[in-house]
Amino acid sequence: MRQRTDPAAHAAAAGARREWPDCAIAGSGERGALAERPTHIAATDTDGTPSEGARADNRAVTDTESGMFGGSGEQDGCAIGVLLCAGSAARMGFDKLTRPLGGRSAIERSFDALLGGGVAGIVFAVSETTRQAAERLAAGAPVPCAIVQGGATRQESVKNALEAIRRTNPPDGAVVAIHDAARCMVAPEIVRACIESAGRTGSGIAAVPVADTVFRQEGGALTPVPREGLFRMQTPQAFRFSEIRDAYARADGAATDDATLYRRAGYSPTLVMGSADNEKLTTPADWARAERMLTRYGTGFDTHRLVEGRKLILGGVDIPFERGLLGHSDADVLLHAVMDALLGAAALPDIGHLFPDSDPAYAGADSMALLGQVVQRIREKGMRPLHIDATIIAQRPKMAPHIDAMRGNIAAVCGISVHQVGVKATTTEGMNDEGRGLCISAQAIASVV
């Protein structure tokens, strides 16, 4: 057995337009005295996920003085999103908002959720670290966008965004949906439910009931706290613009969210059912959890005939045998199955499309090099291989002596540990074409994140 090529070299090489709903929210309901407005839960389906698509050729405004609502009362009741992306990410240890997460950054995922929830415009409150990402999104957005500098605290960032909205002269009844970009797993349905609640009652705060047993520690004593009626606040938090602006103008102290200031100002917040998935990215453990939620899977299969006069290459290993696999490239069925599994997980075209057998450039191509190109394409989408499991189906030759080398080759090119690659071999007990020694096949499943 010998290595056909250097996997390290290949590892180095691997280094529909969206349709958005019209701006509209539910009509305003009858309002009583602020103190009499009841707090309630408006249930909503949270199964939706932000859709993907191009944003090119759409209008964008990055000047905060531009009329985000067009300055017309004709859009009375429209909503504008505020996307907060000015945090320091000190506990995360890296820039959690711009780093790819399952192919898209947290800013992009939250931005898409606001758009999917039906906002008519978006104001980004940014830091110098996130400004460039916000500018890219704004440049291709299907709604007007503005970018403001974030403050030293979340409260200051929101205040800056509200001031930018005020300068656009929003119409009566306008709603603002304030969202932490770090809550990038929010579903558009939650955004829409919060906006609709704000249109009816003045506010719509995403929240989830406390499900765990709660204790308060005082000194060395633990006292149980009844969890009935307890909720964990999330975002988005949507409000009538006039009311939340009033609440911020009257703020006389710090608050960790907008609903707190809203309540201090004498308003009664309305809760909207959030989701356990809508957690904030704060620690590395939160990031790992989000990656698990966003893991994608693909499968691959390939088969080639055994013929005389060809080398038998499997998993980048040249295996001594009297026959080899027939194909336009080196016919490495194992790597071909792995490549198609990875491409499927990333929703990319298969190897027949990327490396057609009608192209002379791929005649006799080294499949290790092709795998490197596949990994590079996946990384260009902001993803990376996570796990690979493959099975070789062949009557002969014996594969066991070569399995470890195959795993090492695949791991090296994919940039993962050999412990994240499984390769097995099986026979068909003399049945079918594999069993009669006419061909060798392989199947694989892969995950990317």
Residue ranges, per PLM feature:
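N-terminal glycine-rich phosphate-binding loop and ensuing alpha1 helix
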Residues: 71-131
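Short phosphate-binding loop-to-helix
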Residues: 139-174
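Short aromatic-hydrophobic micro-motifs that form the base-stacking/packing surface
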Residues: 175-179
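RNase III-family endoribonuclease catalytic core
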Residues: 182, 190, 284-285, 292-404
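Conserved core of the sugar-phosphate nucleotidyltransferase
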Residues: 185-272
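Short, conserved loop-to-beta-strand elements that form functional interface hotspots
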Residues: 389-398, 402-435
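C-terminal edge-of-domain segments
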Residues: 434-449
